[in-house]
């Protein structure tokens, strides 16, 4: 059994993931198949929707505006992740 503080933290984390708000068989959904796919928090879903609506193009390939925008977004993401991890950007690999 979790104490009240731990339960509050878990609840606040779960609230960030829209799918985890579902009930299955009358109980809160618990998703344990993370080897197959990971659930996304609302912030990630919103960022992906914005990307697909506004900047969707191949990175490092196009010699056009959308390709340049997509490449800047991609490399900006790599730079931010590297900063959070305290490593060089070329050490960060982004997988689909």
Give residue spans per PLM region:
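Pyridoxal 5′-phosphate
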Residues: 1-96
């Amino acid at each position: 059994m979790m104490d009240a503080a731990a339960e509050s933290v878990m609840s606040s984390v779960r609230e960030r993931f829209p799918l985890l708000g579902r009930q299955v068989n009358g109980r809160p959904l618990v998703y344990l198949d993370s080897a197959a796919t990971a659930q996304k928090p609302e912030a990630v879903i919103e960022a992906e929707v914005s990307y697909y609506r506004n900047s969707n193009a191949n990175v490092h390939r196009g010699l056009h505006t959308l390709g340049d925008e997509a490449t800047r977004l991609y490399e900006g993401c790599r730079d931010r992740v590297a900063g959070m991890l305290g490593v060089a950007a070329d050490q960060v690999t982004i997988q689909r």
